[in-house]
């Protein structure tokens, strides 16, 4: 070992012999301890074991430092196929105590089919007690897969759904909005949390002084607020007018209490743009059209137009052909709504006109480049 200070050759050799079943790993580890204080090598060797019975697992006998190194490693835990259910629970508890956010999440993903959904729920909530480290390239995938199981099971359980929504929010910098289904439900059902975010991010009407602490908090929550793109009260592609009106009225009342009523039209327009289509095949759905007609303002219109156009995202430049198609599509939509929903139609005419101007601009630019 004098010529192998890192222990790489020793590890490779022992690993080969162990896989062949030639050596007793515990004896090798004791021998290594007697001639070296290489903790990394020791941890590597212990990690070769497939744990079947945790009472006899090699890692159980080690000190706190080795346990922290073992459970903090980005190497998949090796648990024998013969292991009992309690071994997986033991592993979770040990990893929570000694490991990192990433190794705990990785382990939770690996054993999600080995434990009950109730145990998975409980173990997932405990993520909030673990100090987060730098997200790995797989963090978002693990979270999405675990949350998907829990969301499908507990979305209609108000208490558990609220707990999961809190955890989704904690992971907002990793999860995309479409994977934050419990938070979506919370916001769609009631405007209280959304209004709370507004109170943190925006100033009140009385020109309140913003201290450094509130500015930092606003910066922390803004990314999550910006991700929140939803139509209030929408469920399974349907919006009921009475429910939507109740949500809108409560939201307005909350803004008034927060001295932020001036933001009402802008915020509502931003959300209503995410309405499902109507039964007649045109956008937005009938309930949203009725609300727009009732609460229409210039700020609502502007916010709706911006949100709708932002949905397009990145697109190919094709001399204005795509923009011309969009102009015609939105114009047709507006004309279908014009008689019964004039304010809503006005919004769609505005979007249509914007794309018409953009189509003309792109066409001329393409001609100039020839």
Predicted segments with their positions:
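Short, charged, amphipathic alpha-helical segments
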Residues: 344-354
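Amphipathic alpha-helical coiled-coil segments
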Residues: 355-369
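Non-globular sequence segments
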Residues: 299-311, 317-318, 367-370
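Inter-repeat boundary and helix-capping residues of tandem alpha-helical solenoids
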Residues: 316, 323-324, 341-342
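Non-catalytic all-alpha helical scaffold/repeat segments
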Residues: 1-309
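Structural register within alpha-helical repeat arrays
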Residues: 13, 74-75, 267, 326, ...
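Short amphipathic alpha-helical heptad-repeat segments
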Residues: 319-331
């Amino acid at each position: 070992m004098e010529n192998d200070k890192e222990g790489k050759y020793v590890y490779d050799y022992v690993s080969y012999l162990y896989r062949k079943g030639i050596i007793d790993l515990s004896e090798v580890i004791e021998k290594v301890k007697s001639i070296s204080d290489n903790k990394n090598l020791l941890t590597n060797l212990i990690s070769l074991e497939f744990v079947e019975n945790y009472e006899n697992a090699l890692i159980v006998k080690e000190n706190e430092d080795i346990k922290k190194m073992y459970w903090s490693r980005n190497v998949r835990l090796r648990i024998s196929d013969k292991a009992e259910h309690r071994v997986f629970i033991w592993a979770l508890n040990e990893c929570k105590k000694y490991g990192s956010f990433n190794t705990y999440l990785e382990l939770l993903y690996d054993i999600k089919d080995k434990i009950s959904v109730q145990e998975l729920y409980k173990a997932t909530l405990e993520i909030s007690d673990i100090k987060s480290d730098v997200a790995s390239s797989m963090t978002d995938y693990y979270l999405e897969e675990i949350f998907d199981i829990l969301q499908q099971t507990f979305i209609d359980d108000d208490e558990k759904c609220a707990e999961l929504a809190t955890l989704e929010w904690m992971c907002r910098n990793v999860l995309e909005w479409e994977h934050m289904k419990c938070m979506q439900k919370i916001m769609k059902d009631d405007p209280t949390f959304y209004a709370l975010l507004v109170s943190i991010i925006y100033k009140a009407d009385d020109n309140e002084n913003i201290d450094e602490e509130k500015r930092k908090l606003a910066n922390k929550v803004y990314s999550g607020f910006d991700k929140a793109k939803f139509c209030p009260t929408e469920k399974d592609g349907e919006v009921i007018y009475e429910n939507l009106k109740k949500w809108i009225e409560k939201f307005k009342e909350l803004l008034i209490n927060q001295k932020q009523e001036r933001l009402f039209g802008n915020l509502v327009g931003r959300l209503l743009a995410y309405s499902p289509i109507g039964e007649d095949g045109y956008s937005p759905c009938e309930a949203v059209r009725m609300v727009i007609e009732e609460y229409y303002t210039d700020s609502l219109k502007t916010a709706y137009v911006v949100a709708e156009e932002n949905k397009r995202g990145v697109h190919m430049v094709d001399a204005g052909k795509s923009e011309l198609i969009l102009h015609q599509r939105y114009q047709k939509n507006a004309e279908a709504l014009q008689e019964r929903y004039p304010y809503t139609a006005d919004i769609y005419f505005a979007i249509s006109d914007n794309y018409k101007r953009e189509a003309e601009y792109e066409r001329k630019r393409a001609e100039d480049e020839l």
